[in-house]
Amino acid sequence: MTTPLVEMDGDEMTRILWQMIKDELLLPYIDLKTEYYDLGLEHRHETDDQVTVDSANATLKYGVAVKCATITPNAARMTEYNLKEMWKSPNGTIRAILDGTVFRAPILVNGIVPYVKNWTKPITIARHAYGDVYKNTEIKVPGPGKAELVFTAADGTETRELIHNFDGAGIIQGIHNTNKSIESFARACFSYAVDTKQDLWFSTKDTISKKYDHTFKDIFQEIYDNEYKAKFEELGITYFYTLIDDAVARVIRSEGGFIWACKNYDGDVMSDMVATAYGDLSMMTSVLVSPSGVYEYEAAHGTVQRHYYKHLKGEETSTNSIATIYAWTGALRKRGELDQIPELCNFADKLEQACIKTIEDGKMTKSLSLISTCEHPVILNSLDFIKAIRETLNSLL
């Protein structure tokens, strides 16, 4: 390696797996260079979350990052970790700095049949990675009063809309997005569809959200008509817009094989649904692609809290590390492409092949065994599964 990856460490069970993957599958094989940032909740707390901002800025500098799953604290976590503040989602902070789009796709393996039987091809979720509820401002309303939405233009002109006249306690939320970010999102989706030669679907709720969601719809249509329509027609692929509820029904009836572009929250929810329906959330790749050509790879799942508590008690866990391994392989391959190191790309390919072959040979974690058609699966603990992948990798290299 010539340029380091930006390495963002994380929390709980995924943090344990992170080190296992490095020790067993990376360090023995490659000259791994990383610029390390500890995004574990304790360290974010110690640095007042500055470490998250620093890691995102380092990603802008170097171009490729790999991120471990992290805790986004809620009230229970504030008590558990004795936090002075309910720190924002690290992913939300990073995505706000990098902008871009999150593409999530299932890892398909022979022997793991989707719950939706007609899904024979992967569905890629393209999730807008900026704004909306992830960069919101919230107020708990203590009692009666008037809530208003106020925009003050640069020249001092005010636009004012009544949100609600409260006669008691309640809640208010302010969300935003920018045309620039929506345009970047649209172009990323159309470009990805052209690159992968797949149809693109986009869905919002513009019938209810006549300004906010309708702006998303209008920007997508304008960019498609002006910049991508001819290319789509040349490739024989289509762009299709529909309401989010109709899209969900169509997705379930489909055979897969397309990109489904979603707003930030919709993409968060639907990527979990799609991943689980294909088999397991730990079998889902995730990459954030920014308009400036910056890439951040991560697993699409959380920190596996339940397994971590078992691990702390000294109990054995059988945690699927595939998506976290694929975060590393995605980042290493992209680094190899950018730095023209074919050996690094080849290693990433071989490690992914080793993951698939290990599962198809019947060696897997407990969650995979529950959905596998393999008659006599060998259920391995977290470390032994990684060691089994290492054995397969050795046979492929």
Language-model features and meaning:
Residues 251-350, 357-361:
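Glycine-rich phosphate/nucleotide-binding loop
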Residues 41-55, 217-258:
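N-terminal small/polar loop signature for handling phosphorylated ligands or for N-terminal nucleophile
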Residues 30-36, 196-204, 228-241, 336-348, ...:
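Flexible, glycine/charged-enriched surface loops at secondary-structure junctions
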Residues 13, 17-18, 23-47, 56-59:
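N-terminal alpha-helical transmembrane segments of multi-pass membrane transport
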